[in-house]
Design a protein with these regions (language model features):
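Bacterial Sec-dependent N-terminal signal peptides
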Residues: 1-33, 37
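Extended soluble regions of mature proteins
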Residues: 29-217
């Protein structure tokens, strides 16, 4: 794996919000083990690209906008030269703990608590892999015990620049709005980080999206 110098930041999506910082990584597609895996098995990984930048987003979700109870967990955006990945960070961390522990010859009892804690940090969420050369994304999801995969063209949002600036972690951010798949969103982006990407399926602004939320949040 190539060592890469990455920067640190925190951001905000969805029905709710997202957050980020960074280190080194490669954009990977984790293949989840079946429920009845053997303890000696490691998780198969395919390296698609090497991350040039990565951002951790803290997602906040409510079942309905009026619900006072919200769920929060980390998601990770990895940006490479050809691909980008958007994953549930808790599940990715749990997979890393599993792999490292199995390779080190540990018994399940030796790492179960750490692995379980990482899993508990997150909620089931979709995994996205963007192939920018082909202009498509692959989505992997799981509902209960059923696993789903679909491919679609990378969505292109139509953005409207709006008045108003903000500062997020020292970065000057600008406001933009869009309507995407039946919902209206407000986004903040910074031209100081020159990547036209963001959380989930959002992108296309002249800089990294640092915060996005649905207007009904």
């Amino acid at each position: 794996m190539k060592p890469l110098l990455l920067r640190t930041l925190f951001l905000a999506i969805g029905i709710g919000s997202l957050c980020f910082h960074s280190t080194t990584a490669s954009a990977q597609a984790p293949q989840k083990p079946d429920k009845h895996y053997a303890l000696s098995d490691t998780i198969a990984l395919t390296i698609f690209d090497y991350a040039q930048y990565r951002a951790y987003y803290q997602k906040e979700y409510r079942d309905v906008p009026s619900d006072p109870k919200s769920y929060q967990w980390l998601q990770l955006l990895q940006i490479g030269s050809k691909y980008q990945g958007y994953v549930n960070y808790g599940e990715l961390r749990a997979d890393s703990i599993w792999n490292a522990s199995i390779k080190a010859g540990k018994s399940r009892n030796g790492f179960h608590n750490e692995w379980s804690a990482a899993k508990d940090e997150s909620r089931p969420d979709v995994y996205l892999l963007f192939d920018r050369n082909k202009g498509v994304l692959d989505a992997y999801d799981k509902i209960f015990i059923n696993k789903y995969h679909y491919t679609e063209p990378i969505p292109q949002q139509q953005w409207t620049m709006a008045e108003g600036d903000s500062t997020i972690l020292g970065y000057t951010c600008h406001k933009a709005t869009t309507r995407f798949r039946g919902r209206d969103y407000i986004a903040w982006y910074t031209e100081e980080i020159p990547y036209p990407y963001g959380p989930y399926k959002f992108g296309g602004l002249p800089g990294l999206i640092t915060c996005i939320y649905d207007t009904q949040r």
